């Protein structure tokens, strides 16, 4: 279907349509786009005009196509001449806006045919058909002549992009540029643009902004363009918006109802009038002053020049004072009357904004932006609203010495006094100004904004110095509550969610927000300025940006945090990469469009930067090259100079640059780590050969056997794992990883010796020469405060090495006895004398983190103890703790020695806080034994020492001044909640301790918020209560605390409703096990639905969080099998006024499916009565034989077998997918609603993608569909020729049956009786008897009719009729079975006199 414009003449295009479909290359490039948008916030309408300058790549250019989705094309002009020959083909509107009753695919099909519907939309397919694309096709008039012209001569006429200049064959000459103008209109957009006008009575909170969550599928919803990342051009954006908030939805044309006096009275605020009047008053004052001075000229001793200087200074001071007074008055007016606030346009390159009055409408203004650097349409963004704006203060400009305290104090004073002036003054310098925009709400005040974003200035300054110049002139950030993802990256603009902001009293988001802001700024260099040529090249851009984030983390937070993050990222990759495809081919066969919101790129963001890190380590270690510090600036320089074609980066080009810098081939590295999946798992054996004086190492790769062992579902849940399995059944695992590795051996002289070895096979045997010539003695313990570390004596004595030790706390006998600790020098469960015979202290494999791997080394436990205490490297300490954790978990060892080592590690404040957390987590892995004094008891003692009153479980008043201790305080209860005894239950000791912490928590004297801490405590207490929910006494205490904190948050709301939503979900969990009567569920749902966004008691983010939590509980509490609940859910999904809730609702559905599949809770939910009855009828219809009847009646007997099969199926992802499909295939209401929703035009592109992906997992898609056709007429028209007379021909047309059935007449044969025979007289001799001849009578054959048998049915009871069995016997008998809906009762036989019942007990069912 094609939709034509009003005056279109499609004949000229239809004949050539086949040519358009066969075009497989672009025959033009876009050089420049000028977009004019008139935005109406009140009606959600945008009137746009796009002026596009294209450069033909062929001379006979006949047609051009642009991506246009969900917009109405009003007019098209080519070279300022109207063009009626265009076609706007929008399948999305054509297929979804029509009547669904007339849709052949919709009528008689269901959700199993959803993939046919998906194939109709190009954005949802990897290789879409041409007729499924939403395109505007324009015919270039034949009157326009295209010829080659000089490119330099045309550079003044149109800004040709670098992609054109650097394209081979187009350097000296280009074809004649063509200018097209497209007029269009957008109403109520669903994707690409988001209107937020939910506050009907607060128009100053209305806003509209662009969204690019779906890559290369967002910009075409609001501007005609070629929506590809490599189609870059320069831009000019012109916005027509209301001048003030009160002008929204109004219009006042010039000359209407009076002249401009009306404008001054009604539309211009008072301060504008004052501004116009003040210069005149100043001039008059100057004249008076000059007259007085002329009169007294002879009396004054000053010269004329000095007087003039004094006057200028006084005038400048007075102007500044007047401006400050005007700003103050204006701020007061805006605070008193928000409708007087200015409407602000935030766009790229805000430093060159031009604000002009509207030419015809007095209530509007025009804002014009220019983007000189070529940018793809996907990265053009803007936001409009009555925003507050702040300029970030400058932290340390390059000209100021950071060590000079005096100058730094002066600079700080100047920055505080003149924040806005510094931005204007430094635009031309190396400082990149950053502007922040937020809505005028109480939650986003100046302190909150500056506290969260002040680090951005230092981040962007570090990037520009280390990796190359910032590609734009400025940067702005807009924080909005409805942004679908944490940050959306545009050219010189970032649109972020307000959840990244945090006030001064919240410290939990400090690290996460800083990391997200660092990513947003790094993406400006890589992902915006430099883009991938193909989707599978995205790993390069994300890897570069992530590597930049690593370096700025090292700069801002220190080397320990940097190394700890690297090690944790490596462990996370090992945990997740058992089911992931290679990052170099992730998007081959994957779901489209690629979305930031659905975390399609999350694993690449994790792994790609680590690959660049290990590549950098190998390059700098083996070849002594500069590594990534030379590669990245070289790529950025190529992008700025035009040497990188179209600023599009490919994997092959990135590999080529790395090889040029490294001066060697890296093909094996890229094949193993980029184009292969998985990570190595290394098992290392070591032995010292005293005869040869070498250390013999054996390194074996065992990832084929151990990677993903006993893992079914990844970190992101069942839905993501299932989708990855369906999209990438072949993971292309790397069998053997190769490359260099650094081995560090700490020998007895205290010196670490490094050895670089090469791994070339799955098993590598290495001999490392021993270096120490003389035997050293080692002084154990002590030395914690010795900074020199090594003592050298001139005497001829054995060298004694004094080693600085960590963990040397709680060493006195009293402390060891009180806390059940072993001696500090005892570090092994084996014989301590063995340590004296060892050739080295400890050995580290891959000491420089050149491999992303999991390592197992068979060195003794005392070596790991030395490594933990004496090696200052964070990675070494973490490896040692992982060893103890592995021994406790897999070895089942209850070692007090190991527990004491972990205790001292966790309690020693000199350790990095991440190491202390890891030690606490390792202690929680001990299986609880009342007779064992270590493990869990040590973990409780750590919390008591740090945070409780002496010898009690009552915590001290909270004090979060020390962030390191705060993270310990938050995480130790989480680790305690995981503790189990031998029976898999949580010990009473732990349960009571966690409850005491929650009961006696006190935050009155703390200046920081404890909302996140209380939320964590509630989650942990509920978790241990669910572990043994039959403990009614403990359960009552838990419910009492839930009620207490619920009342508290009702009086004093928590930050983003963290505590309230946690209590809601806790109640659902308790109700699920029968420990809580969830009677208020209905009231809670109704309260949340009727609360409305306009409620001023809570923030917007709090309302959104509460609403989504209620929606989640409703679905889990039976809503997935309740038609009314599903109808409510789909209405929210499609029609809720908050776009954030609409987008996140589909994520809630996916999360609920994850939960019910993993815990099997859907089986405990009863279906609707109507759907249950319908399913019974369907089963009865399928009964065809006696075997089917017996199978139907004995269906409940197969439950045991079903449980066994399900248990086997849960051991792999394929079995889980089948279990999921079995759960949902029989419930028709959900299938019908999902099918109806997919056929509605109200969904956004993200929602449509997510539902299609979810359906692909939940149901088996069938490659056939039902089509209903009209019944053909019984008669058809036929023509017969009759020629009765010569020369005359009659043609008779009449209707004749289509099928002629010739039925033969019945032949009834009647047999006549033969005639009577003539009597023959025979005379015989003698008196003998005469024999008579019998008559031959032939009777006709008569078919006997079937005899009717009367029968009746005796029915027992009122249950639904399930089975009727009729037996044909001499005496007809009818047997009935009336089976109730129970798996324990079965009526096997019923007659008129008796019936048989079979009853099973629960014990029988289990057996």
Swiss-Prot record:
Biological processes per GO annotation: positive regulation of transcription by RNA polymerase II; transcription by RNA polymerase II; transcription initiation at RNA polymerase II promoter
CC annotations in GO: nucleus; transcription factor TFIID complex
Subcellular location: Nucleus
Keyword Transcription regulation applies: yes
Keyword tags: Coiled coil, Nucleus, Phosphoprotein, Transcription, Transcription regulation
Any one Gene Ontology molecular-function term assigned to this protein's record: transcription cis-regulatory region binding
Broad class of the protein's primary localization: nucleus
Residue ranges that the Swiss-Prot or TrEMBL entry lists as coiled coil: 304-337
Residue stretches of biased makeup (Acidic residues): 308-326
Basic and acidic residues: compositionally biased ranges: 277-307
Annotated CDD domains: M1_like_TAF2
Stretches that traverse the bilayer: none
Phosphothreonine carried by residues: 158, 161
InterPro entries on file: Aminopeptidase_N-like_N_sf, Peptidase_M4/M1_CTD_sf, TAF2
Region ranges (Disordered): 252-336
Ranges where the record places region Highly charged: 1285-1350
Residues bearing the modification Phosphoserine: 163, 318
Entry-linked PANTHER family: TRANSCRIPTION INITIATION FACTOR TFIID, TRANSCRIPTION INITIATION FACTOR TFIID SUBUNIT 2
Family indicated by similarity: Belongs to the TAF2 family.
Subunit structure: The 1.2 MDa TFIID complex is composed of TATA binding protein (TBP) and the 14 TBP-associated factors. One copy of each TAF1, TAF2, TAF3, TAF7, TAF8, TAF11, TAF13, two copies of each TAF4, TAF5, TAF6, TAF9, TAF10, TAF12, and three copies of TAF14.
Protein role: Functions as a component of the DNA-binding general transcription factor complex TFIID. Binding of TFIID to a promoter (with or without TATA element) is the initial step in pre-initiation complex (PIC) formation. TFIID plays a key role in the regulation of gene expression by RNA polymerase II through different activities such as transcription activator interaction, core promoter recognition and selectivity, TFIIA and TFIIB interaction, chromatin modification (histone acetylation by TAF1), facilitation of DNA opening and initiation of transcription.
Miscellaneous remark of the record: Present with 1200 molecules/cell in log phase SD medium.
Name of this protein: Transcription initiation factor TFIID subunit 2
């Amino acid at each position: 279907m094609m939709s034509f414009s009003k005056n279109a003449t499609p004949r000229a295009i239809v004949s050539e349509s086949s040519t358009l479909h066969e075009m497989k290359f672009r025959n033009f490039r876009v050089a420049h786009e000028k977009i004019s948008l008139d935005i109406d916030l009140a009606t959600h309408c945008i009137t746009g005009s796009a002026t596009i300058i294209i450069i033909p790549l062929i001379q006979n250019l006949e047609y051009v196509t642009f991506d246009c989705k969900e917009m109405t094309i009003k007019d098209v002009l080519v070279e300022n001449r109207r063009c009626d020959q265009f076609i706007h083909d929008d399948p999305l509107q054509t297929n979804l806006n029509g009547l669904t009753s007339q849709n052949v695919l919709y009528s008689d099909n269901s959700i199993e045919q959803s993939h046919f519907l998906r194939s109709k939309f190009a954005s949802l397919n990897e290789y879409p058909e041409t007729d499924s694309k939403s395109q505007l096709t324009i015919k270039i008039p034949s009157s326009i002549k295209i010829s080659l012209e000089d490119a330099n001569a045309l550079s003044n006429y149109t800004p040709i992009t670098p992609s054109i200049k650097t394209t081979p064959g187009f350097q000296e000459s280009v074809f004649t540029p063509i200018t097209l103008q497209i007029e269009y209109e957008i109403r109520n957009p669903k994707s690409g643009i988001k209107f937020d006008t939910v506050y009907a009575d607060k128009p100053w909170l209305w806003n509209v902004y662009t969204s690019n969550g779906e890559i290369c599928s967002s910009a075409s919803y609001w501007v005609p363009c070629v929506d590809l990342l490599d189609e870059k051009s320069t831009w000019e954006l012109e916005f027509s918006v209301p001048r003030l908030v009160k002008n929204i939805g109004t219009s006042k044309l010039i000359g209407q109802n009076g002249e401009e006096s009306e404008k001054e009275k009604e539309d211009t605020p008072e301060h504008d009038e004052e501004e116009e009047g003040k210069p005149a008053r100043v001039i008059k004052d100057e004249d008076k002053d000059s007259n007085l001075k002329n009169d007294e000229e002879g009396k004054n001793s000053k010269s004329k020049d000095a007087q003039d200087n004094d006057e200028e200074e006084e005038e400048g001071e007075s102007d500044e004072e007047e401006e400050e007074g005007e700003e103050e008055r204006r701020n007061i007016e805006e605070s008193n009357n928000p409708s007087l606030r200015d409407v602000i346009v935030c766009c790229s390159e805000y430093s060159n904004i031009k604000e002009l009055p509207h030419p015809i409408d007095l209530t509007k203004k025009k804002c014009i932006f220019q983007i000189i650097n070529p940018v793809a349409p996907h990265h053009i963004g803007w936001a409009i609203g009555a925003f507050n704006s702040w300029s970030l203060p400058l932290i340390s400009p390059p000209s100021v010495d950071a060590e000079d305290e005096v100058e730094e104090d002066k600079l700080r004073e100047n920055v505080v006094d003149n924040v806005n002036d510094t931005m204007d003054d430094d635009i031309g310098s190396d400082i990149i100004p950053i502007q922040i925009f937020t809505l005028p709400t109480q939650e986003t005040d100046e302190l909150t904004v500056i506290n969260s974003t002040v680090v951005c200035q230092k981040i962007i300054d570090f990037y520009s110095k280390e990796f190359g110049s910032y590609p734009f002139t400025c940067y702005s950030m807009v924080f909005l509550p409805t942004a679908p993802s944490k940050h959306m990256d545009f050219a010189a603009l970032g649109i972020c969610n307000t959840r990244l902001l945090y006030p001064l009293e919240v410290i939990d988001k400090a690290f996460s927000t800083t990391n997200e802001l660092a990513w947003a700024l790094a993406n400006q260099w890589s992902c915006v300025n430099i883009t991938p040529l193909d989707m599978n090249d995205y790993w390069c851009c994300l890897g570069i940006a992530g590597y930049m984030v690593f370096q700025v983390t090292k700069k801002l937070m220190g080397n320990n945090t940097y190394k700890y993050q690297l090690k944790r990222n490596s462990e996370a990759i090992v945990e997740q990469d058992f089911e992931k495809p290679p990052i170099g081919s992730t998007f081959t066969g994957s779901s489209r469009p690629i979305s930031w919101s659905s975390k399609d790129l999350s694993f690449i963001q994790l792994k790609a930067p680590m690959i660049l890190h290990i590549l950098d380590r190998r390059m700098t270690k083996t070849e002594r090259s500069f590594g990534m510090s030379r590669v990245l600036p070289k790529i950025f320089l190529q992008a700025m100079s035009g040497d990188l074609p179209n600023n599009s980066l490919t994997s092959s080009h990135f590999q080529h640059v790395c090889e040029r810098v490294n001066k060697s081939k890296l093909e094996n590295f890229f094949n193993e780590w980029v184009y292969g999946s998985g990570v190595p798992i290394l098992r290392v054996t070591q032995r010292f050969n005293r005869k040869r004086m070498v250390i013999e190492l054996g390194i074996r790769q065992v990832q084929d056997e151990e990677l993903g062992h006993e893992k079914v579902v990844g970190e992101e849940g069942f839905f993501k794992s299932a989708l990855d399995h369906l999209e990438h059944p072949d993971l292309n695992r790397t069998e053997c990883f190769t490359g260099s590795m650094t081995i560090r051996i700490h020998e007895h002289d205290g010196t670490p010796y490094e050895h670089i070895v090469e791994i070339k096979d799955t098993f590598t045997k290495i001999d490392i020469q021993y270096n120490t010539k003389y035997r050293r003695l080692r002084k154990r313990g002590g030395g914690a405060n010795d900074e020199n570390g090594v003592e050298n004596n001139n005497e001829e004595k054995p060298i004694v090495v004094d080693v600085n030790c960590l963990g040397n706390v709680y060493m006195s006998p009293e402390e060891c006895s009180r806390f059940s600790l072993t001696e500090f020098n005892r570090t092994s469960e084996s014989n301590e004398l063995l340590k004296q015979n060892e050739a080295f202290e400890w050995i580290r494999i891959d000491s420089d983190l050149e491999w992303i791997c999991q390592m197992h080394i068979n060195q003794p436990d005392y070596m790991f103890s030395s490594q933990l205490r004496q090696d200052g490297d964070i990675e070494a300490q973490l490896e040692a703790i992982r060893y103890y954790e592995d021994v406790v978990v897999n070895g089942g060892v209850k070692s007090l020695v190991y527990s004491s080592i972990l205790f001292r590690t966790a309690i020693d404040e000199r350790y990095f806080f991440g190491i202390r957390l890891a030690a606490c987590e390792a202690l929680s892995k001990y299986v609880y034994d009342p007779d064992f004094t270590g493990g869990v008891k040590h973990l409780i003692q750590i919390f008591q020492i740090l945070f409780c009153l002496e010898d009690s479980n009552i915590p001290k008043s909270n004090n979060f001044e020390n962030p390191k201790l705060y993270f310990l305080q938050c995480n130790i209860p989480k680790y305690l909640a995981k503790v189990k005894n031998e029976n898999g239950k949580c010990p009473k000791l732990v349960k009571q301790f966690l409850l005491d912490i929650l009961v006696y928590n006190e935050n009155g004297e703390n200046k920081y918020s404890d909302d996140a801490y209380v939320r964590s405590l509630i989650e942990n207490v509920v978790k241990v209560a669910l572990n043994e929910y039959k403990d009614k006494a403990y359960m009552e205490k838990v419910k009492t605390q839930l009620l207490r904190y619920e009342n508290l948050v009702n009086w004093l709301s928590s930050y983003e409703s963290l505590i309230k939503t946690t209590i809601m979900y806790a109640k659902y969990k308790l109700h699920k096990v029968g420990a809580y009567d969830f009677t208020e569920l209905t009231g809670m749902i109704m309260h949340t639905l009727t609360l409305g966004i306009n409620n001023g008691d809570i923030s917007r983010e709090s309302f959104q969080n509460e609403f989504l939590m209620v929606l989640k509980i409703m679905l889990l509490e039976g809503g997935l099998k309740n038609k009314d609940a599903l109808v409510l859910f789909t209405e929210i999904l499609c029609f809720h006024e908050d776009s954030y809730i609409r987008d996140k609702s589909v994520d809630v559905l996916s999360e609920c499916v994850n939960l019910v599949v993993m815990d099997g809770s859907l089986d405990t939910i009863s279906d609707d009565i109507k759907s249950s009855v319908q399913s019974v009828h369907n089963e009865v219809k399928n009964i065809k034989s006696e075997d089917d009847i017996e199978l139907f009646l004995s269906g409940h007997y197969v439950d045991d077998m079903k449980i066994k099969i399900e248990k086997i199926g849960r051991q792999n992802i394929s079995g889980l997918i089948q279990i999921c499909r079995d759960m949902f295939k029989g419930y028709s209401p959900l299938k019908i609603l999902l099918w109806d929703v997919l056929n509605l035009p109200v969904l956004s592109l993200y929602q449509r993608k997510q539902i299609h992906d979810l359906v692909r997992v939940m149901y088996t898609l069938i490659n056939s569909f039902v089509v209903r056709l009209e019944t053909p007429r019984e008669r058809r028209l036929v023509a017969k020729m009759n020629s009765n007379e010569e020369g005359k021909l009659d043609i008779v047309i009449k209707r004749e049956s289509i099928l002629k059935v010739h039925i033969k007449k019945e032949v009834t044969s009647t047999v006549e009786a033969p005639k009577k025979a003539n009597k023959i007289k025979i005379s015989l001799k003698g008196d003998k008897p005469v024999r008579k001849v019998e008559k031959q009578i032939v009777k006709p054959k008569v078919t006997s009719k079937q005899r009717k048998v009367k029968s009746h049915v005796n029915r027992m009871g009122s249950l639904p009729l399930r089975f009727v069995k009729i037996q044909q016997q001499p005496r007809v008998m009818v047997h009935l079975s009336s089976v109730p809906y129970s798996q324990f009762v079965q009526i096997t036989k019923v007659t008129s006199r008796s019936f048989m019942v079979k009853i099973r007990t629960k014990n029988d069912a289990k057996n």
